[in-house]
A protein has these predicted regions:
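N-terminal secretory signal peptides that target proteins for export/translocation
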Residues: 1-14
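Bacterial N-terminal signal peptides
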Residues: 14-27
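Structural preference for beta-rich elements and adjacent junctions enriched in aromatics
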Residues: 27, 31-180
């Protein structure tokens, strides 16, 4: 199902995301010994900030997600590390296809949107499909542009009842007025 960017824009710019950037700057500070290999097995992940409460955004119902997702966040001098554990019973078919870079990912995926400056003027969107397809873009009030190609890293892996996506977004990926 195609992503509804209008819904995302409305949600993204409903309020400034200064809290999100502040979170990244104050989150689990670690020395980067994380290998982006699609497996969250490094000791740093055990001490990462953990988020587990998510709602359905496609379709945009706001209801509690049907299957649990765990997101771990670590901030280092090199950037932000994000690890997703996406639980999905083996009995439920996964959409696990590879798509070209920046093509619409019509598969199971994780999306991270960050307003690095906390101004609600520009957000950076990073999407990883379950087969490690990547899509990124810039979100501004009323617009989404996939013309931007940031340098960031991801890898995914899959088990019977869950799949991982592991992401590293370097601080240098976007201009910031207050870089860490």
């Amino acid at each position: 199902m195609p992503c509804s960017y209008k819904a995302m824009l409305k949600t993204l710019f409903a309020a400034p995301l200064t809290g999100l950037l502040g979170y990244f700057l104050l989150s689990s500070q670690a020395q980067a010994a994380i290998s982006i290999d699609g497996v969250l097995d490094e000791p740093e992940w055990a001490g990462a900030e953990l988020y587990t409460e998510f709602v359905t955004v496609e379709p945009l119902t706001g209801e509690q997600a049907k299957y649990p997702t765990e997101v771990r966040l670590i901030s280092t001098a090199e950037g932000i590390f994000i690890g997703f554990t996406n639980y999905q019973p083996a009995s439920i078919k996964r959409v696990n296809r590879q798509f070209p870079r920046d093509a619409e990912i019509e598969a199971d995926r994780n999306v991270v949107s960050i307003d690095f400056d906390g101004t609600a003027l520009a957000g950076y969107d990073f999407t990883v499909g379950s087969a490690n397809s990547q899509q990124d873009g810039i979100v501004t009030p009323g617009n989404y542009s996939a013309d931007w190609d940031g340098i960031w890293y991801s890898q995914t892996s899959s088990e019977a009842d869950y799949w991982y996506s592991e992401i590293h977004i370097p601080w240098t990926v976007a201009p910031m007025t207050n870089s860490p």
